[in-house]
């Protein structure tokens, strides 16, 4: 199991339900889908928001 990391939301599109996170330690941006957001109610992220995540390999590369 991967370790939890921190990062910043680069952008998130509410209508499409996905966006990208820039890891705090550097590296490639990670795809994030609204289904992966651990939150009650409407699942969205704001540009510039600090988040914690676990990176894992998805169908098209690494994702949060």
UniProtKB/Swiss-Prot annotation:
The keyword DNA-binding applies. Pfam families: CSD. It is found in: Cytoplasm. Induction: In response to low temperature. Signal peptide: none annotated. GO terms for molecular function: DNA binding. Its main location: cytoplasm. GO terms for cellular component: cytosol. Keywords: Activator, Cytoplasm, DNA-binding, Stress response, Transcription, Transcription regulation. It comes from the Bacteria. Residues 7-64 form the CSD domain. CDD domains: CSP_CDS. InterPro entries: Cold_shock_CspA (IPR012156), CSD (IPR011129), CSD_CS (IPR019844), CSP_DNA-bd (IPR002059), NA-bd_OB-fold (IPR012340). Affects cell viability at low temperatures. This is Cold shock protein CapA.
């Amino acid at each position: 199991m991967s370790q939890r990391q921190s990062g910043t939301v680069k952008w998130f599109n509410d209508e499409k339900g996905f966006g990208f996170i820039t890891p705090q330690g550097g590296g490639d941006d990670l795809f994030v889908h609204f289904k992966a957001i651990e939150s009650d109610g409407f699942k969205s992220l704001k540009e510039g928001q600090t988040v914690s995540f676990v990176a894992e390999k998805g169908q098209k590369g690494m994702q949060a």
